[in-house]
Design a protein with these regions (language model features):
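Bacterial N-terminal signal peptides
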Residues: 9-18
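Bacterial N-terminal signal peptides that target proteins for export
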Residues: 1-9
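Conserved, well-structured beta-alpha core segment at the onset of a catalytic domain
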Residues: 2, 19-22
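Charge-rich (acidic/polar
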Residues: 23-182
Length: 182
């Protein structure tokens, strides 16, 4: 199983290197090449999606460590409720967990987004120096930690709502059979 995961990570890493090479070639191509702009536009789109999702209280992958390893989140459990054949109680409990998670995560997400904006402003306003950047990055990471903890801890609780069979079905639906879901 670890060999399978290592293979997946190696393939993803290799794909990233290949994509990086393609972008580099496009940047250095004669005639101006627009790979550079496309790469930055893709990064900006990702940053915009991050802001939208985190602003809504969602985790934007901050709980992958849990989800990939058999600790599902309530939102995805509800998305798969028919396949999981959730009982009425399970569905109600998952909804409560999701509501509580979003309620706690939204203000923490807003703090994270504000900390990220503050870091960007340091550079945009040309006032960045080592001390200011270190302080701003520390603030960003404190805020990110708080958002991430909300999501990871909710995944811990959500796991207990499901039977072993439901966890297996969930994991296969979300991740294939790459990791144990016990």
């Amino acid at each position: 199983m670890r060999r399978v995961m290592l293979g997946v990570y190696a393939a993803v890493g290799l794909a990233g290197l290949t994509a990086g090479t393609t972008v580099t070639r496009a940047q250095h191509a004669h005639g101006g090449g627009d790979g550079h702009a496309q790469g930055h536009l893709a990064a900006q789109a990702c940053a915009s999606e991050f802001e939208k999702v985190v602003g809504e209280g969602r985790g934007f992958g901050l709980a992958f460590a849990a989800d990939q390893n058999g600790y599902p989140g309530p939102m995805h459990v509800l998305e798969l409720k028919d396949r999981l054949t959730l009982s009425a109680d399970q569905e109600a409990n998952a909804r409560e967990l999701m509501h509580a998670m979003f309620t706690e995560s939204r203000p923490k997400g807003a703090r994270l987004l504000e900390a990220e904006a503050k870091l960007r402003r340091l550079f945009a306003e040309r006032v960045a120096d080592e001390a200011a950047v270190r302080a701003a990055v520390a603030e960003v990471e404190r805020a990110r930690t708080e958002v991430r903890l909300v999501h990871l801890l909710t995944h811990l609780t959500t796991r207990d709502l499901l039977t072993e069979d439901q966890r297996r079905i969930y994991h296969e639906a979300r991740w294939g059979a790459l990791a144990p879901a016990q």
